[in-house]
Amino acid sequence: MDYDTDKVDEAALALLYLNLFEDRWGARAWKSMPWEAMDRLHEKGLIGDPKSKAKSVVLSEEGLIAAEVAFRKLFTSP
């Protein structure tokens, strides 16, 4: 099945925003998303490298903003 990977990435980013938490390294989110989407988000500079032993991933400043925008667009009521 063909699908729009940009839409998948936007939804993955919005879901990362849903489980966002702050620690001493900044905004982090649990990385239980499809690896392909996580790799694309990393290539776009929106998250840190997901290939680590950590169970969470760091969002860049740009990624944090994009995640909130995607979350509000996809999941909030009008």
Predicted features by range, described:
Residues 1-35, 72-77:
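Short amphipathic alpha-helical interface segments
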Residues 10-13, 53, 66-69:
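Residue-level detector of intrinsically disordered, flexible termini
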Residues 13-16, 46, 59:
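Generic leucine side-chain signal with a strong bias for well-ordered alpha-helical environments
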Residues 34-37, 67:
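Amphipathic alpha-helical interface surfaces
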Residues 40:
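Alpha-helical DNA-recognition elements
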Residues 43-52:
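A short, conserved structural fragment
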Residues 54-60:
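Minor-groove-contacting beta-hairpin "wing" of winged helix-turn-helix DNA-binding domains
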Residues 61-78:
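Short, amphipathic alpha-helical interaction segments positioned at domain boundaries
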